[in-house]
C-alpha cells in the first residue's frame, strides 16, 4: 500500500487568521476492553517527520508528514479523570485538543502512543490557501517523495472515468454536481 494524501484548506474569512491542520492516525481501541488483546503502537520516526505504526494484525506502516511542525502523541483511551473522576491513562485521547486549545501539557513527549496528530500551523490571509501532503505506506523505511506526478495521473484517470459516464451535453456546473454525486457513492 502507498497512499498519497493532499489536504488543502482556504481562509474564507475577511481577516488574516491562524489555521491548525491536525491530520490524525489512530488505532481503534480494542485493548482496554479485551484483556488478551495486544496494544498497537505509534511512534515518532524520520527525524520527527514521520509516524511509525505497528499493529499485531495490520502489520507495519509509516505516515510521512514532511511539512509537519510537530507530532503529538496520546493514547486512544477515554479521559477517566475528566468523565468519571477516576484515574486513567496519562495521555488520554482528548490530550491533542487540550494541547491545541489550552496549551496544556497533555501529549506524550516521548513521542509514542496509540493516537498521533501531525501539527501544521499556517497563517493565512483572506482567500489564501495552504496545502499539505502526507504519505501512508507499508514501506517502513520510506521517505517523502514528490507526489505531484501521482496526483496528476489520478486526476487524469478520474477525468477519463467521468467523461466516459457523463453526457457530453451537460454544462460544467452539472458535470461538477454529477461528479460529487458519484463520489458520494464510492
What are these regions (language model features)?
Residues 170-186:
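Structured secondary-structure scaffolds
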Residues 138-147:
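Short, Lys/Arg- and Gly-enriched loop/turn segments at beta-strand edges
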Residues 115-118, 169-170:
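Active-site-adjacent structural elements in folded domains
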Residues 41-42, 106-109, 119-124:
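Beta-strand-rich interaction surfaces with strong enrichment in secreted/lumenal proteins
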Residues 23, 120, 184-186:
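Conserved, well-structured core segments
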Residues 1, 80-114:
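Edge strands and adjacent loops of beta-rich recognition modules
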Residues 4, 10-93, 152-168, 172-175:
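Polysaccharide-binding surfaces and accessory modules of carbohydrate-active proteins
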Residues 3-6, 122-138:
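Short Pro-Gly-centered flexible turn/kink motifs
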